[in-house]
UniProtKB/Swiss-Prot annotation:
Substrates-to-products reaction catalysed: a very-long-chain (3R)-3-hydroxyacyl-CoA + NADP(+) = a very-long-chain 3-oxoacyl-CoA + NADPH + H(+)
Single GO MF descriptor: very-long-chain 3-oxoacyl-CoA reductase activity
Protein name stated in the entry: Very-long-chain 3-oxoacyl-CoA reductase
Pathway annotation: Lipid metabolism; fatty acid biosynthesis
Protein's cellular compartments: Endoplasmic reticulum membrane
Keyword entries, A-Z: Endoplasmic reticulum, Fatty acid biosynthesis, Fatty acid metabolism, Lipid biosynthesis, Lipid metabolism, Membrane, NADP, Oxidoreductase, Transmembrane, Transmembrane helix
EC top class, as a word: oxidoreductase
Segment forming the signal sequence: none
GO biological process, one term: fatty acid elongation
Active site residues according to the UniProt entry: 217, 221
Topological category with respect to the lipid bilayer: Single-pass membrane protein
Listed InterPro entries: 3_ketoreductase_fungal (IPR027533), NAD(P)-bd_dom_sf (IPR036291), Sc_DH/Rdtase_CS (IPR020904), SDR_fam (IPR002347)
Length: 340
């Protein structure tokens, strides 16, 4: 084996020596540039993940400025609301359940003296224009500086597109896409008029890599990626920062993951990173996009730098993983049905 390798190396060296010297220099330069690009990408990863911080949120408004948070009653939305309140922002909380919104608003007002809150119960899946009109009236005259587009829905369990219920398919697209766009359409003019503001939209690994058995959800997040990067360019002259946040799993009701780990943070950890890493672009394919949680960023960099996040191998692995998750979910449901 060793002798065969030595022979191959000898043949390669002989071939290289036969190449004209100008071409050797050209190939060597291209190779050096490729290695340099990889090294710079790795340095950027380390700086953005462990050393650099984003701007102070005061960039978007003084104490008492308002922040609009959608999907605010649970999970990441609830944590965004809590951490923005801790930084002196008043809150407009938008979600489906009135009782949860009222409870959260009361909890935060008791915790943070002087905090003002407004709540709006609306079901984004209904795509009711009257709801967006109510939102516009609610925030009219407020000094809104931040919009957190957090509302979203995934599939209840991984499922093939052919077996996806029509109602689930429609709900995912309506909430994730139309809900985000229509909310932004209401809030963005206020941010542009005041010449400063932040629009932060939640993305997903599923939007950066095609994800079989979550096809509709994956497509909705990919749509938001392109929309967000386009919107960022449009609103930059108005002083509005538009940022798209990439995340892997976080312990939320939507992810159905209960335990934190090295790769899976809790909402508090993730939101702290998301608000602290604004503007630190870590996705070289799309500007104004960042992956705030360090292990998510490292994981994504490894995939991007090796097999590629849209390669056939990555899609195959994604399919295999989600078929397994589906099968385990179905077995669990069958066991619970027997108990009843």
């Amino acid at each position: 084996m060793a002798s065969q390798i030595a022979q191959l190396l000898e043949k390669a060296l002989h071939f290289w020596n036969a190449v004209p010297q100008p071409l050797q220099y050209t190939f060597a330069a291209l190779g050096a540039l490729y290695v340099l690009r990889g090294a710079l990408s790795f340095v950027r990863l380390l700086l953005n993940s462990f050393i650099l911080s984003g701007p102070n949120l005061r960039k978007y408004g003084k104490k008492g400025t308002w922040a609009v948070v959608t999907g605010a009653s649970d999970g990441l939305g609830k944590e965004f609301a809590s951490q923005l309140a801790s930084k002196g922002f008043n809150l407009v909380l938008v979600s489906r359940t009135q009782s949860k919104l009222d409870a959260l608003a009361k909890e935060l007002r008791l915790k943070w003296s002087g905090l003002e809150t407004k709540v709006l119960a609306m079901d984004f899946s209904q795509d009711n224009d009257e709801d967006y009109e109510r939102l516009a009236k609610l925030i009219a005259g407020l000094d809104v500086g931040i919009l957190i587009n957090n509302v979203g829905q995934s599939h209840s369990i991984p499922v093939s597109f052919l077996d996806t219920e029509k109602t689930e398919l429609q709900s995912i697209v309506t909430i994730n896409c139309l809900g985000t766009l229509k909310t932004t359409k209401v809030v963005a003019p206020i941010l542009a008029a005041r010449k400063k503001g932040l629009i932060l939209t939640m993305g997903s690994f599923a939007g950066t890599m095609p994800t079989p058995y979550l096809a509709t959800y994956s497509g909705s997040k990919a749509f938001l990626q392109h929309w967000s990067s386009s919107l960022a360019s449009e609103l930059a002259p108005h002083g509005v920062d538009v940022q798209f946040v990439i995340s892997y799993l976080v312990t939320t009701a939507m992810s159905k993951v209960r335990r934190t780990s090295l790769l899976i943070p809790g909402p508090k950890q993730f939101v702290k990173a998301a608000l602290g890493k604004i503007g630190l672009d870590s996705n070289e394919n799309f500007p104004n996009t960042y992956t705030p949680w360090w292990s998510h960023n490292v994981f994504k960099w490894i995939i991007d730098s090796t097999v590629g996040n849209t390669s056939a191998f990555t899609i195959w692995q994604n399919r295999k993983m989600h078929v397994d998750i589906r099968n385990r979910a179905l077995r669990k449901a069958a066991r619970e049905a027997k108990k009843q």
